Design a protein with these regions (language model features):
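Intracellular juxtamembrane helix-capping segments at the cytosolic ends
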Residues: 6, 94-112, 227, 307-320
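Helix-to-loop junctions at the C-terminal end of transmembrane segments
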Residues: 34-47, 150, 253-267, 351
Length: 385
């Protein structure tokens, strides 16, 4: 909602797809850099204080973004101040989703990345499916809400609502009793066994799921930007959020179904197959010339998206070392946001220069790269086993 809200607001007040994409990219870059830092701090100091602090800082940053964007529009300029505030809004975004996954892994007995004798894999798969579905609701229905509020009321309202939700809901998650399931690393009983150096170092294999999430984010961001340009030629940029929500509906349903899929295939094969299907369906984005046709394509395209996210998060939890789940989960989330920034920027620039058709090539490339990374993950996990 923050990225799409920034894209919509800045595009609306500046009249430039490139400016909107750049501002949305600044949000993504800030989040990409800030999320792992917040995750590492949560690993070391506990989730509650970090979540409470980030909720306050993010609310202030988002409100400052609204004021700065509208002030620059009145002055007829687009200064670096807008990008700086957008960066701050992204960097302070509370990492609720990734830290919720850490809590689930702890509650299902998988906090150290290994499965105990009771084999909680199905419970964990169910939890991660639920979290990915919740992510889809926010990633996709959030932009839909942006489109509704921006078109019916004002372009600044979605960001104001985001600030209100952050300051009211994030503290509730921060103080929820489940935060005790993930003790701070500095107080963890297992710290001595790892030595005085603190939490374990991150292995290089963590880069595979992180880069995969960068591809996912690039897919999301470029699709959003391309849809904005596509909708502008038919009904106005505000309708792009509603189109994007169609993909989210099928993606959320498919993510929720992953817990019931056969487990024989394994995570790597599931990753590769879903990514290949994503790439094939993304090519269809080049075909539509009307809103109903585009909606139908997006409905199909969403089917492999949710399962890929569930699978990559599961792989990330599997390769994460003890005491670093918060860092790894936030790194995966930051990969999505960084990719969204990259995709928004690339998609916005291509849409501005060559039209939506060129911008739709970016999600195709992102899905192909995602499939290749899945092949690499298959090799690595086979050796790990």
């Amino acid at each position: 909602m923050l990225t799409m809200g920034t894209l919509t607001l800045v595009t609306s007040v500046s009249g430039s797809f490139a400016a909107g994409g750049t501002a949305a990219g600044a949000v993504g870059i800030g989040s990409a850099l800030g999320a792992p830092l917040l995750g590492s701090l949560a690993d070391r100091s506990g989730q509650r204080p970090i979540l409470l602090l980030s909720a306050v800082l993010n609310t202030l940053a988002v409100l400052a973004l609204v004021l700065t964007a509208n002030a620059t529009a009145a002055a007829g300029d687009f200064p670096l101040a807008v990008l700086a505030v957008a960066f701050a809004a992204g960097a302070t975004s509370p990492q609720v989703g990734p830290l919720a996954r850490v809590r689930w892994m702890s509650l299902t007995g998988n906090a150290d990345g290994t499965a105990p004798p009771s084999d909680p894999a199905r419970d964990l798969d169910t939890a991660l499916s639920y979290e990915s579905t919740a992510d889809e609701v926010t990633f996709v229905l959030g932009p839909a809400l942006v489109g509704i509020l921006a078109s019916l009321v004002a372009p600044w309202l979605p960001l104001a609502l985001a600030a209100a939700l952050t300051i009211t809901l994030v503290p509730g998650f921060a103080v929820h009793p489940t935060h005790r399931a993930v003790p701070a690393a500095r107080r963890s009983p297992g710290r001595k066994s790892r030595g005085a150096g603190g939490p374990a170092k991150l292995p290089w294999v963590v880069a595979l799921p992180v880069f995969a999430m960068v591809c996912m984010g690039t897919f999301f961001g470029s699709t959003q930007a391309a849809l904005s340009a596509f909708a502008a030629g038919l009904a106005g940029t505000e309708i792009a959020g509603l189109l994007y929500a169609v993909m989210g509906l099928s993606s959320a349903a498919a993510a929720l179904s992953v817990a019931y899929w056969p487990r024989r295939a394994g995570l790597p094969l599931r990753w590769v197959l879903c990514a290949v299907l994503m790439a094939a369906l993304a090519v269809l984005l080049l075909v539509p010339s009307s809103l109903p046709t585009m909606a139908a394509v997006l409905l199909l395209l969403g089917l492999p998206v949710g399962p890929v996210m569930v699978t990559v998060f599961a792989v990330g939890g599997r390769v994460a070392p003890a005491g670093r789940l918060g860092t790894v989960m936030t790194a995966l989330a930051s990969g999505i946001v960084a990719g969204t920034a990259l995709g928004s920027s690339l998609g916005g620039q291509l849409a501005q220069l060559y039209g939506p058709g060129a911008a739709f090539l970016v999600p195709v490339g992102a899905a192909v790269t995602l499939a290749l990374l899945g092949g690499g993950a298959a090799v690595v996990l086979r050796r790990k086993d």
